[in-house]
């Protein structure tokens, strides 16, 4: 039998017979490791302990102490355990797919009756019984005919369709959890008892089309969350409760910010209060871009398919594009256009107007670009996922030698913006070259080194995601952390060696010859809509004074103060503050309560005493009591507080 060499994390290597399993490798190191092992990582691929290893490579044995591999396995096994529990409780239910996702998993089921909260409780109880039984988990590789015959006998049409989608030559792997079996790539734990029974929870049910296709059957998707221990689960459920209180859709109604309706699914109807936040954020970003030497442009929203074909987007993204057919006068055929799903091809058109010199680079073109992408109706979620959105988009055209400086400048801008907006912490992930890519190894080496160099020069921590870059260049992803610990991927910095070539972007180099520029895609916020949703939830609607749509409400205590109320509002507006009057015939406590629900940061109560003294009684949101100030002093204080952070 041939031998293979396996290298361990400490650099030591051992020879094993080809076909050795990870379990046997663990046993060869120490009995305790074999006992605690749950999976292995082979050349970066997560495998289970039963898989035969055919070739030499780098191996690490994972235990429950290795949080990421452990959580992935726990959640993956729970998806199977849940599907088994459902079919044991309701044998007529058909199973489909059940992937791991952030904090948990989901599984889609075909069932005539809707799952109820009581059903979820019954499923959880059955899952705990399966875990307590410590049923063994095993795997086999089947041929296609055997697998098809099995699923035809079981009456599982969705599994047959999945089977047909597996490419010829790829192994068809079946996993058993006890007597229940599923088609799965793995990996999995060794027995159901390795799943912590007190650290998971089924959270909710939602509708989902089969394979995300609205023309296919509507299924029921059961979601679950899972962690390594009970305390982590409890902390997560507490966070979910807090997140529900902060839900931007609920706060959007209370604060009268925006709404959606069936006549324009996934498109935002901004109300005056919400549009105020949008415009304030846009003005802030525009000032930051001007200061960083970006040139703002505006490009068309409706563009002929010819450009999308040249850029490659027609082939890759056509299903997600809104197509517009136009009868041109005198033309034999309709002209086919598309609402732009992204801005980059149009930005290259602006760059291409006039021959550029190396002295013109870097050229930074920015646009608050309106884009449209078709998203399945089931995937839309308030402002967080919409069909029509505006990106704080910019593209930098530069030489290869300028990538690092441009990257460092962008990270500095992003860091400053996030801090101004209340996000002190963000993480960086560097995704490097995939196997299939465009561009020479030399330019990939240079670009990856430039991105690493920029991050390290700024002394920032980062993770490397090997092989996860786009086919056209390496990228950085930036995840900010909000007030309740959730991560949101917003910022991006992406090198592109492909689009400038496809759209024939050039510049004249110092040598007098024509060269292709590198195109850097970058965004700080991502989209205004989603980022405003994040801001609302981060602040629980209690936005900083400079962003608050209604900064001050001046409320009368008695009708005799109405004239003074309007005088105060006029003075506040003259000072640049967003102020409103409330002279309704209601008690002051009622007015304060109503405006507090609307998250107005400052409420000025005005009665006869304030009229006489030309003062105001100021109540701050979420603070007890009130303070009396002279009118001019109060206006000066609020004006300073309401100044945007970049202008202070």
From Swiss-Prot:
It is found in: Cytoplasm. GO terms for molecular function: ATP binding; metal ion binding; threonine-tRNA ligase activity; tRNA binding. GO terms for biological process: threonyl-tRNA aminoacylation. It comes from the Bacteria. Keywords: Aminoacyl-tRNA synthetase, ATP-binding, Cytoplasm, Ligase, Metal-binding, Nucleotide-binding, Protein biosynthesis, RNA-binding, tRNA-binding, Zinc. Its cofactor is Zn(2+). Zn(2+) binds at residues 344, 395, 521. Its EC number is 6.1.1.3. InterPro entries: aa-tRNA-synt_IIb, aa-tRNA-synth_II, aa-tRNA-synth_II/BPL/LPL, Anticodon-bd, Anticodon-bd_dom_sf, Beta-grasp_dom_sf, TGS, TGS-like. Binds 1 zinc ion per subunit. Homodimer. This is Threonine--tRNA ligase. The lineage of its organism: Bacteria, Pseudomonadati, Pseudomonadota, Alphaproteobacteria, Rhodobacterales. The gene is thrS.
